[in-house]
Amino acid sequence: NTVGNSSTASTSTGATTILDIDQVGNSNVIKYQINGATYTGQINLQGNSNDVDLNCDSTGNNSSCGSANAVISFIGNSNDIDLDIGQTSSATAIDADIVGQSGSDSNVVAATVDGNSAILRITINGDTNNYLIDIDGNGDVVGHTLIHSHTGGIADVDITQSGVNDQMITLTTSGDNADI
């Protein structure tokens, strides 16, 4: 199953985008760009070796993806999840969840969020996962929030948060060999 491909993304352009994608099987690809003021969506994956690259405000032509509510949920191994929100302009309200169900091993999650009020929850229940998280933008009045939960062994987590004030991280890990 493919939405977009490795070199060309599918695109939604307009004020509001609502997107729901379910993919079952191995080696699914989602490469999607959203250019607009508001994004609400859910991506559900079942299978191994899936590749998701979701960009909200990738060109900056139609607002800033100012409001985004994104959920990416998967069960499977060796998935590559890349979520970028507010790439060219700081978003004002972001609520994003990345959830790996029990048995989700050897996954890579990269999330770059640029926003004033950014809530990013990552919950993955599996072993040997790698997280690269960058939350940027102006903090203050409930800005920069990361809630991370990890169950399983061997997690490599890199988190960068920046801005002024409101930099909150809640982190729970379980298992051995966590490199944070």
Where are these regions (language model features)?
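Low-complexity repeat regions of mature extracellularly deployed or surface/particle-associated proteins
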Residues: 1-180
